Structure formats: structure tokens, C-alpha cells
């Protein structure tokens, strides 16, 4: 039994003649402890896919199964890290994390909850900022709060929806390493949504492209045959890295060209000759 499984999943919006088919015939299997990355173009339906897996949306048809049971709503078993930090601005770092753990562990004492908060804030190197509010933090620090909040709930699966996309290169690289360090400690199942092929290769066991929408579907998987822990500098000289990267980019370019060709056919404007208004 797969840990996470999507079977023939379709998702559309609208009714009757105004239906937009966002996702079409999505089939995905992720095993326990695996780190899988899905790469795709902006607007291809990646966030819709995340919301289906997390239970924020229901599929139009098909099944989303977590540990063999249908996903019928959100659960702290599946922790989500969004690109938008979604921190409550009137609460401190510690209070933002505390709200999450209080919801996830209602039977724990206040002391136990505070210890959990402190442990995870320390894990993302934010202990000196635990009493600061979001407006006092940089973008990278805010995203680390979001990481701490998601992980402090002790989810069995971590779902990341382009969590590092808005960060500068240095902060992004540091957070990639922090997420990998946390993941490697207990090998929680992880799903990363990204539009960065290099990020996917560095972090994941497998990369699966999502074709452009509408009617977006998953392409072939690419296994990352590079030993862990991975070194970004050394990877540049790794023949498996070069081969995998080239194959993924070539595939994405091909489907991108196909989509452009279809779009041009769909939106060819008629030739209209101007009327002469001269009597």
C-alpha cells in the first residue's frame, strides 16, 4: 500500500459551458519516507494539486488516498509549507508556532507545548527572534517560522508549495539545507512543489514534471541517482546530475513549445479590413 496515492484524479472549476479543467487524469504514488519533487510552469495547477492532497479541495473525480484512506479534509498528519508565510502579524514568532501545536496536541500541558515550540524555533535557528513579530523579520526568517510551525505539529508528511520561491539565492540555499537536515533525521515523507529544476534535483529522490494546463497531467518521472548527502558544488561535476538535469529541461522545453503552439492556434485573430468612411 502506497503512503500517498492519487488515482485518476480530475479537478475542474465552473459549470456547464464555463467549465475549466485544471488537472486531468493525475496518477501519483509516493512511498513512506520518500522525497518527491513536482516541477512545472507557473499556472500549471501545482497549487491546486497541493490543495487536493492536503484536503483543502475535493477532486471532481478520482481518489486521493493517504495511508489507504480517502482524504476528506485537512489534518495535522499532513503539514503544509506555503510560499506565502501566512503568519498572524499581531503574534510573535513563538505565539505563531504555539497556535499550531496547541491545535495539534490538545491534550498536552502548556509546559509541554512551550517546550515543543522552543525546540522547533531553535531547530530553524530563530531562538533570538522568538519574541519578535513578523514585521520585524526578514523574508527568510518569516519562512523559517512557517517551516517551524509546520514541523512542530509533527506531521507524518511534509508538503511544500514553492516555499522558497520568493527568497534571495543565499537564503534559499540555506533553507534548502535546513529542510533536508530536518527531513534526514527521521525520513518523513516529503513532497516539494517547485519550478526550479536544480532545487528538485538537489532535494528529491524523484522528479515528476506537471504538464501545462488546462488539462494538466503528470509527465514521466526522473529518478535522481546521486548519493546523499549532496554537495551543490560537487554536483556540478557529477555526470548523473548533468544527464538528469539535461533530460528534465529538454522535456520541459518540449512540452512548453507544444503548449505555445496550441495556444497560438487557439488565439489566431481574424484579418479585419478597416472600413472606409470617405463618402
Question: How would you label these PLM feature ranges?
Answer:
Residues 54:
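Helix-to-loop junction immediately C-terminal to a conserved catalytic motif
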Residues 152-156:
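A short, proline-enriched helix->beta-strand linker immediately N-terminal to the Walker B motif
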Amino acid at each position: 500500500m502506497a503512503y500517498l496515492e492519487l488515482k485518476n484524479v480530475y479537478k475542474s472549476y465552473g459549470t456547464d459551458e464555463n467549465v475549466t479543467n485544471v488537472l486531468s487524469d493525475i496518477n501519483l504514488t509516493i512511498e513512506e519516507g520518500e522525497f518527491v519533487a513536482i516541477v512545472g510552469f507557473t499556472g500549471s495547477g501545482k497549487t491546486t494539486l497541493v490543495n487536493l492532497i492536503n484536503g483543502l479541495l475535493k477532486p471532481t473525480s478520482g481518489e486521493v488516498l493517504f495511508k489507504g484512506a480517502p482524504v476528506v479534509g485537512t489534518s495535522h498528519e499532513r503539514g503544509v509549507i506555503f510560499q506565502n508565510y501566512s503568519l498572524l502579524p499581531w503574534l510573535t514568532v513563538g505565539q505563531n508556532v504555539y497556535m499550531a501545536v496547541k491545535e495539534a496536541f490538545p491534550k498536552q500541558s502548556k509546559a509541554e507545548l512551550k517546550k515543543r515550540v522552543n525546540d522547533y524555533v531553535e531547530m530553524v535557528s530563530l531562538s533570538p527572534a522568538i519574541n519578535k513579530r513578523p514585521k520585524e523579520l526578514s523574508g527568510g526568517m518569516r519562512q523559517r517560522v512557517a517551516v517551524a510551525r509546520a514541523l512542530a505539529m509533527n506531521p507524518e508528511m511534509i508538503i511544500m508549495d514553492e516555499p522558497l520561491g520568493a527568497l534571495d539565492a543565499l537564503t534559499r540555499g540555506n533553507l534548502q539545507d535546513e529542510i533536508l537536515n530536518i527531513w534526514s533525521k527521521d525520513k518523513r515523507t516529503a513532497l516539494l512543489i517547485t519550478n526550479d529544476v536544480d532545487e528538485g534535483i538537489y532535494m528529491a529522490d524523484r522528479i515528476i514534471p506537471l504538464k501545462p494546463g488546462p488539462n494538466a497531467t503528470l509527465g514521466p518521472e526522473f529518478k535522481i541517482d546521486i548519493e546523499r548527502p549532496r554537495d551543490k558544488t560537487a554536483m556540478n561535476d557529477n555526470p548523473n546530475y548533468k544527464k538528469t538535469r539535461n533530460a528534465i529541461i529538454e522535456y520541459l522545453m518540449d512540452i512548453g513549445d507544444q503548449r505555445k503552439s496550441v495556444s497560438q492556434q487557439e488565439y489566431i485573430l481574424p484579418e479585419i479590413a478597416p472600413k472606409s468612411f470617405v463618402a
